[in-house]
Amino acid sequence: MTFNNKTIEELHNLLVSKEISATELTQATLENIKSREEALNSFVTIAEEQALVQAKAIDEAGIDANNVLSGIPLAVKDNISTDGILTTAASKMLYNYEPIFDATAVANAKTKGMIVVGKTNMDEFAMGGSGETSHYGATKNAWDHSKVPGGSSSGSAAAVASGQVRLSLGSDTGGSIRQPAAFNGIVGLKPTYGTVSRFGLIAFGSSLDQIGPFAPTVKENALLLNAIASEDTKDSTSAPVRIADFTSKIGQDIKGMKIALPKEYLGEGIDPEVKETILNAAKHFEKLGAIVEEVSLPHSKYGVAVYYIIASSEASSNLQRFDGIRYGYRAEDATNLDEIYVNSRSQGFGEEVKRRIMLGTFSLSSGYYDAYYKKAGQVRTLIIQDFEKVFADYDLILGPTAPSVAYDLDSLNHDPVAMYLADLLTIPVNLAGLPGISIPAGFSQGLPVGLQLIGPKYSEETIYQAAAAFEATTDYHKQQPVIFGGDN
């Protein structure tokens, strides 16, 4: 059997009853990955040997009947460290990097009995919004292989949407979980900054990065967040987990919940069919008893400019460590130390990564720091204050995840600004450190449309409550791409 139509709870029951073993489930998952991989290119590394060793150990120890994730396979984005499994960040620079430790999020998942089956493809060093900047080639959209899957967590989203795996981990710096979740018609959550440890995540923008879960349904997404969230002494920005169970409000009604709909999120640049889908979703929330009202987030229009200054500046600093000396790619044509640095970085980094390093270095340089980086920080504060004003009166914010559905592969590669604008609606959430989720809300041109719900810090359980209420009364999450197939 392929098991790709079974929910996590259904798989758990099969494992506990010993109708299947963790090894059999892992083998079936590996076959699902391999059978779809040529079409999607969603994995950089398939960790077959390591996964089967893990599965055997779990079978020998016995499935934990009280832990729904015991024996469940997990795919991990390739910028999240995995002990003994290549972690390349989809870059030539780290083509041979094999960590000797697990990221805290991965270690937490393994503690729950999850089995790492592979590392998913991504935009190089998480810099990109289409899944096309990977050194290992572009990932394809699960619904239409001529379209982008979104990025940067392209492989993690496509793998879940296509039925290669049920659950995966991604990272979100400016929308890198939510946008590919929207483009592939699945559920992706960016947690409150600090909820999931960044230890072991290859750093891009340290004040923005956050690891989060992908799943086909809201509850399964929350179950994975339960597994990975933790305070961590190895990450000074991690926070105590304030919610014992992220599924605790799932199933509760949302009567009286106040939801804000920012007028800026449905303005210029939003595809008309996407706008219509979101307005219909707002009406659906009203039918469920929520109060939906229009609000304004006046500084959100500056989000993209602020983000690309701050994120690029942080990337410029973080990526200085990759110099061809200690590990990673080293240029063979270098004859002295300066040439090792210059040639290794020039040859090891892709074009988008180099573009952002240069932008960040410029923003931090003497004479420009005040005009760019300092000013961006000041406007970031205004964006945060806009959210705080809205959340003084509302429980959640509703809007589209992306301005459009998935676009054609190679259609925006020569227009980086246009590609950057595709993150217009997700970036402000990262700048403010807030939680945000993307859930399926409809279709346009045969492609999924994502609905984004944003909450104040540490409101994940309320976000899941509203998302689950919408999911329970619609069937968008049940519709699957052709490549998904079914149980056999």
Curated annotation (Swiss-Prot):
Allows the formation of correctly charged Gln-tRNA(Gln) through the transamidation of misacylated Glu-tRNA(Gln) in organisms which lack glutaminyl-tRNA synthetase. The reaction takes place in the presence of glutamine and ATP through an activated gamma-phospho-Glu-tRNA(Gln). Coiled coil: none annotated. PROSITE patterns: AMIDASES (PS00571). InterPro entries: Amidase, Amidase_CS, Amidase_dom, AS_sf, GatA. The lineage of its organism: Bacteria, Bacillati, Bacillota, Bacilli, Lactobacillales. Its EC number is 6.3.5.7. Keywords: ATP-binding, Ligase, Nucleotide-binding, Protein biosynthesis. One of its GO terms (molecular function) is glutaminyl-tRNA synthase (glutamine-hydrolyzing) activity. It catalyses: L-glutamyl-tRNA(Gln) + L-glutamine + ATP + H2O = L-glutaminyl-tRNA(Gln) + L-glutamate + ADP + phosphate + H(+). This is Glutamyl-tRNA(Gln) amidotransferase subunit A. It comes from the Bacteria. Heterotrimer of A, B and C subunits. One of its GO terms (biological process) is translation. Belongs to the amidase family. GatA subfamily. The active site is at K77 (charge relay system), S152 (charge relay system), S176 (acyl-ester intermediate). The keyword Manganese does not apply. HAMAP family: GatA. GO terms for cellular component: glutamyl-tRNA(Gln) amidotransferase complex.
